[in-house]
Design a protein with these regions (language model features):
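Bacterial N-terminal signal peptides that target proteins for export
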Residues: 1-12
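Short strand-turn-strand beta-turns centered on an Asx-Gly dipeptide
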Residues: 144-153, 262-265, 273
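Short proline/glycine- and polar residue-rich coil/turn motifs
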Residues: 154-161, 169-173, 274-280, 290
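Extracellular and analogous surface-interaction loops
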Residues: 110, 114-125, 167-171, 230-242, ...
């Protein structure tokens, strides 16, 4: 018999499980949620798993405990665990730290009101809302509204208490629901909220555990798992060729165990439905190949037996082992060229485009690594350039908008490299973005060619970077340049622009349309005809082709100097450019894909060979990648992580979700989906795999995807300023160092 000792869970947890077992209750009653009707795949648990990559990229479903939705009879929201963030997406966080009183722990409401949004999948209407909290001092008022409907006004006692509120049929909505809490005074401490089906409260219902993660003793060994809840559900993106790996343990009694997977709009498919004898541990290796690249609801449940008597040990999603190419020798030098306002869909590695970029395309096929899903840190230059140079997101480096200043102590790639004796150089007329970074940067040379009378063309940028390389006389160097070709004004290039528009040139648009003209178009003061649109877009496309000529000159210049083999080049954009796809032009007007989906290509002989990587990456990953390529340790303040391991692995990678922000707006990007919250808090959801122009709004059609991104948005909003990918993981895949987990 296995000995079971729970650590890290409240004593009420075991009592709850025993009570449920005595009452004969399983994971969920018929009124709470129907059991999946699908039968198990015949060989679901018998399929022989390939050699799995235990040390490689994986999804740690245990460390991501905050992402699981917890159920007893109904949904449980425990405030003492970071998982409650899934239900709180308010821009101004009303919640404060933890408070422990009389052996119970809760979270303090630091405002007089808070809003929670939660999913509901029950099949009947009548339910009850159970609020467990500490009033702080007697006499506080608590008012509750659900989906805009008043539920109850109550006066709180001084200590811990349980307030039960019947919910009439029709108040709860299948799908997303909004719960509004209003308190007359600050300081109430919330332990948990439970939304359960049925009218009556079972007698002596104990309070739920504050976390699904607990340590158990198995045959004298301590292991960690998910336990204590009859049903656990997590929205998760399944990687290509992924395998679910988990050990199911039954402790003092037998239990029936289920594992199911449900893709959006599809019936749940049972991967496991089995009775497991008491005191046993069964390793489970379940193929998820059928769900590759899909967002699914993964569910562990205990339909029969005590939930406290079952532990799901070390649940993970692993990939098959894959070959990995040898890590290259440290690059001697490195160059970054940022093409301001360059749309990803203007390069042939990203889309079928009319724009001619033979130099970029040829180099990408020969020595390039193209990241096809790159999320800009921001749709505006100052925040994005700061992220490209620092490896941090806007909330961390401090430049949230166009007027912000950099936070003191922000790491900068120029300073990191200079400490190792590497000469650093910046070239570009990007003073609007780059001048504000000077207080924390270390540039040996800083050139603004237009202001220096050397021309504002990208040819001048390339020449000055190559001149800087010449002056190093064999010493290590790093050069960063900004080319303005795709930014307004869109300049006419004789013999190039004609590839896309050969006239006549309307004076209303001219041959150098700037931001004033774009504003006039948006405001309706400049009426656009098909010919004028052709002229405007032809000028932009001609600028991109001219940029390609400059890129070609850079690569030829490096080769002629004998530097091409040991000088990787990174080409990327700070943001994209809009042409009325969503009611505006230029950039900085929103978080849509034409602005935040940007190109990122690494050109490195011996490392790149034309491969494309579809895992989502970020501007914040650029600095740690630069430092890693040059053989140096990453500054611990950097928030992103090196992309070199992703490049070296000759196989799929784990799904990642990356953010972008600008002022109060933000967006979250997965490989196929894009969740956007605008300046006013309005949500949008797009499937960019089938709708790259983001014309079809899916928020009300894809409930699982909406819940997935709301979950991640709550975590993101609470911790974006301090996120550290190397130790915390990504928003959708947490690591052991995820600091709030220690609360």
């Amino acid at each position: 018999m296995l000995k079971f000792v729970v650590r890290g869970a409240s004593s009420g947890l075991v009592m709850a499980a025993l009570l449920l077992a005595c009452r004969g209750q399983g994971a969920h009653s018929a009124e709470s949620r129907p059991v999946p009707t699908a039968t198990p795949t015949a060989n679901a648990s018998a399929t022989v798993a390939p050699a799995l990559d235990e040390a490689g990229p994986s999804m740690d479903l245990l460390r991501s405990g905050a992402l699981w939705h917890l159920y007893r009879e109904g949904l449980v929201i425990p405030f003492a665990q970071e998982g409650f963030r899934k239900y709180s997406q308010e821009y101004a966080n009303p919640w404060r730290g933890l408070a422990k009183i009389d052996d119970q722990t809760g979270r303090t409401l630091g405002a007089t009101a808070a809003t929670l949004r939660f999913p509901w999948d029950a099949t009947t209407g009548e339910a009850r809302l159970i609020v467990r909290l500490h009033g702080g001092s007697a006499g506080k008022k608590l008012s509750v509204r659900l989906n805009g409907r008043p539920i109850k006004n109550t006066t709180l006692e001084a200590g811990w208490q349980q307030v039960v509120m019947p919910l009439p049929s029709g108040v709860l909505t299948k799908g997303e629901n909004t719960l509004a809490l209003a308190a007359g005074k600050k300081g109430a401490i919330f332990h948990s909220i439970e939304i359960a089906p049925g009218e009556t409260l079972p007698p002596q219902q104990p309070w739920p555990a504050t976390s699904p993660v607990a340590k158990v003793q198995l045959a004298g060994k301590e292991r960690e798992g998910l336990t204590g809840f009859s049903r656990l559900m997590v929205p998760v993106e399944i990687p290509q060729d992924g395998w679910l790996v988990v050990d199911s343990a039954t402790l003092t009694g037998p239990a029936r165990l289920r594992i199911s997977v449900a893709a959006e709009g599809q019936p749940a498919k049972l991967l496991l439905d089995e009775r497991q004898a008491a005191g046993t541990v069964r390793p489970r290796r379940l193929s998820l190949a059928e769900f590759s690249a899909k967002l699914v609801a993964l569910e562990f449940s205990v339909p029969e037996g005590s939930p406290a008597d079952v532990a799901w040990l070390a649940p993970r999603i692993l990939l098959p082992k894959a070959a990995s190419r040898q890590r290259p020798a440290p690059a001697k030098n490195l160059i970054v060229l940022v093409a301001d306002a360059l749309r990803a869909d203007k390069l042939p590695m990203y889309a079928d485009t009319r724009v001619r970029t033979p130099n970029i395309a040829t180099a990408a096929a020969a020595t390039g690594v193209t990241f096809t899903s790159t999320q800009a840190a921001s749709p505006s230059s100052p925040p994005s350039h700061a992220s490209i140079q620092s490896g941090c997101m806007p909330r961390s480096h401090g430049i949230l908008g166009d007027k912000s200043k950099v936070n003191p102590g922000t790491p900068m790639v120029s300073a990191i490299l200079a400490k190792s004796g590497i000469a650093t150089d910046f070239v570009g007329d990007a003073g609007f973005a780059m001048n504000r970074l000077k207080p924390v940067s270390t540039w040996n040379e800083f050139h603004m060619p237009g202001k220096e009378g050397k021309g504002g063309d990208c040819q001048a940028v390339v020449k000055l970077m190559l001149d800087f390389a010449d002056r190093q006389e064999g010493k290590r160097f790093f050069a960063a340049g900004v080319a303005f070709e795709a930014h307004t004004a869109y300049i006419y290039h004789p013999g190039t622009t004609e590839h896309y528009y050969d006239g006549p040139f309307d004076d209303a648009i001219g041959k150098r349309p700037d931001g004033v003209i774009l504003t006039a178009i948006v405001g309706g003061r400049l009426k656009m005809t098909p010919e004028r649109w052709g002229q405007l877009k032809g000028l932009y496309d001609g600028e991109v082709e001219h940029l390609d000529e400059c890129f070609g000159a850079l690569m030829v210049g490096l080769k002629s100097r004998g530097l091409s083999e040991n000088t990787p080049v990174i080409l990327l954009a700070d943001h994209g450019e809009g042409f009325l796809e969503h009611g505006s032009m230029g950039h900085a007007y929103g978080q849509y894909a034409e602005l935040t989906n940007v190109p990122l290509v690494l050109f490195a002989p011996g490392l790149g060979h034309g491969q494309k990587i579809s895992a989502v990456v970020s501007h914040a990953d650029v600095v740690p990648t630069i430092v890693d390529l040059m053989g140096l340790p990453t500054d611990p303040r950097v928030q992103g992580e090196s992309l070199l391991p992703m490049i070296l692995r000759q196989g799929p990678w784990i799904p990642r979700v990356m953010p972008s922000e600008y002022g109060r707006s933000y967006s979250l990007r997965s490989r196929n989906l894009h969740y956007v919250v605008d300046y006013g808090g309005h949500e949008s959801l797009f499937d960019i795999a089938v709708d790259p122009a983001e014309k079809s709004e899916l928020k009300d059609k894809r409930p699982l995807a909406l819940r997935y991104f709301r979950d991640l948005a709550g975590i993101y909003l609470a911790h974006r300023a301090h996120w550290h990918a190397a130790t915390w993981g990504t928003l959708n895949n947490h690591l052991a160092g995820f600091a709030p987990a220690k609360e």
